[in-house]
Amino acid sequence: MQTEHVILLNAQGVPTGTLEKYAAHTADTRLHLAFSSWLFNAKGQLLVTRRALSKKAWPGVWTNSVCGHPQLGESNEDAVIRRCRYELGVEITPPESIYPDFRYRATDPNGIVENEVCPVFAARTTSALQINDDEVMDYQWCDLADVLRGIDATPWAFSPWMVMQATNREARIRLSAFTQLK
């Protein structure tokens, strides 16, 4: 995969430039554009993934299915599709927006900061997973209700962005729609 960049943003969310992804994530990470996605299978189960230990931020942490950064000129939806193929080896249904104005800042235990305008999407797949070990060290298909109970009881066991997304009332309602079989 070619070198990825992040799209830097000003406080109003207007693009101001780009920076190489690895170099962008530091103790002083500038605001940038990202996305987060929640992937459901044909049984209505959610895919939760454990980030590879080689990840710069939050290595080894359980999180939602796929996260990433759209590239210059790429839509968020196309970025979700690209990263699902790269990280999970799957084709997905067109991503649906479930929390379009999500924005957060969080610092991991090693001092690396995430500072993102991060629209949240959900999609479905019927493909068998082909996990990229450079991105994902473990995964589990789970009932959404069980995951939400786990987040409510032990938020420290999950990525902060997953917790913030899952505790948003409207996002929970929209995620629940993906548990219905189609």
Curated annotation (Swiss-Prot):
GO cellular component: cytoplasm
Cofactor: Mg(2+); Mn(2+)
Active-site residues, as the UniProt record annotates them: C67, E116
GO molecular function: isopentenyl-diphosphate delta-isomerase activity; metal ion binding
Enzyme class: isomerase
Cofactor annotation remark: Binds 1 Mg(2+) ion per subunit. The magnesium ion binds only when substrate is bound. Binds 1 Mn(2+) ion per subunit.
BP GO terms, sorted: dimethylallyl diphosphate biosynthetic process; isoprenoid biosynthetic process
Database matches in Gene3D superfamilies: Nucleoside Triphosphate Pyrophosphohydrolase
E.C. number(s) listed in UniProt: 5.3.3.2
Entry keyword Cytoplasm: yes
Record family assignment: Belongs to the IPP isomerase type 1 family.
Protein name (database record): Isopentenyl-diphosphate Delta-isomerase
Organism whose genome encodes this protein: Shigella dysenteriae serotype 1 (strain Sd197)
Gene this chain is encoded by: idi
